[in-house]
């Protein structure tokens, strides 16, 4: 994981291979299939094996969510190292068929991707993992703040986490999709608080919760009685 200042970022936008670009490393522990690059646990990135080798030294995208004060980012780092491979052959590629190899978790397989929630301090350039584990082979999703309508035409729209500078909201889902927790995380202490639990004997659908900023009340969309309703929870 690297960072650069705006001047160098603007250089990279013009020419990614500019040798005068200065960037600093925040982490050095990334490895294939467990990197800081935003790798999917459910499909490939569309690159053929030849393209992967050709582009292996290029910068890769990181999907991160910022705190409102821009002092921290949240990253879900996925460990795909034990997940088995899947292949796609493009038989009509010109001049010869191409092969794409990626990690893919099939139903019934034990080797599952593992989600790790990482908080990076963008003032000290340090990071720590938050323990959000509960369900076996769970999926973790940090909720993003909905952009204001008046920003829809802005050239730059940062991804900001739902919450405050010190707290963020996330969901964790069991492998069978029948249990979902809505949680709030205190990024300073690392404390994870379960706000509510959804559990059904069928698939549970979930929507992003609404947070009332002044009262800190919590609005949840749920089908717990067989119909979709909105529920209001106090602090």
Predicted features and spans:
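Hydrophobic beta-strand positions in blades of beta-propellers and related beta-sheet-rich domains
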Residues: 1, 23, 73, 117-119, ...
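Beta-strand C-termini and the immediately following turn/loop, strongest in propeller blades
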Residues: 2-6, 65, 74-79, 107-111, ...
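Predominantly five- to eight-bladed beta-propeller fold
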Residues: 9-65, 75-137
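Signature of short aromatic-glycine-proline-rich micro-motifs recurring in repeat-based ectodomains
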Residues: 38-68, 116, 144-163, 207-220
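A short beta-strand motif characteristic of beta-propeller blades
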Residues: 52-53, 128-130, 147-149, 193-197
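Long hydrophobic segments that form regular secondary structure
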Residues: 121-122, 128-136, 148-149, 155-170, ...
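Surface-exposed loop/turn elements that mediate protein-protein interactions on large endomembrane-trafficking
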Residues: 122-130, 184-194, 230-235
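Conserved blade-ending motifs and adjacent loop-strand segments that build the rim/top face
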Residues: 196-207
């Amino acid at each position: 994981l690297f960072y650069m200042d705006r001047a160098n970022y603007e250089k990279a936008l013009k020419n990614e291979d500019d040798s005068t670009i200065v960037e600093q490393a925040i982490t050095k522990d990334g490895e294939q299939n467990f990197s800081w690059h935003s790798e999917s646990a459910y499909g490939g990135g569309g690159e053929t094996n030849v393209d992967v080798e050709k582009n292996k030294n290029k910068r890769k995208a990181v999907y991160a969510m910022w705190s409102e004060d821009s002092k921290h980012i949240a990253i879900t780092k996925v460990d795909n190292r034990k997940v088995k491979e899947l292949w796609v052959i493009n038989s009509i590629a010109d001049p010869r068929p191409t092969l794409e190899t990626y990690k893919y978790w099939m139903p019934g397989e034990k080797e599952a991707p593992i989600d790790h929630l990482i908080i990076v301090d963008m003032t000290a350039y340090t990071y720590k993992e938050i323990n959000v584990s509960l369900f076996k082979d769970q999926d973790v999703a940090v909720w993003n703040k909905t952009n204001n309508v008046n920003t829809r035409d802005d050239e730059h729209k940062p991804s900001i986490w739902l919450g405050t500078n010190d707290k963020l909201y996330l969901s964790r889902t069991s492998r069978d999709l029948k249990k979902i927790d809505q949680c709030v995380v205190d990024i300073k202490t690392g404390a994870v608080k379960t706000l509510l639990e959804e559990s059904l004997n069928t698939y549970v659908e979930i929507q992003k919760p609404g947070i009332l900023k002044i009262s800190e009340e919590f609005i949840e969309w749920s089908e717990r009685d067989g119909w979709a309703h909105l529920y209001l929870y106090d602090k």
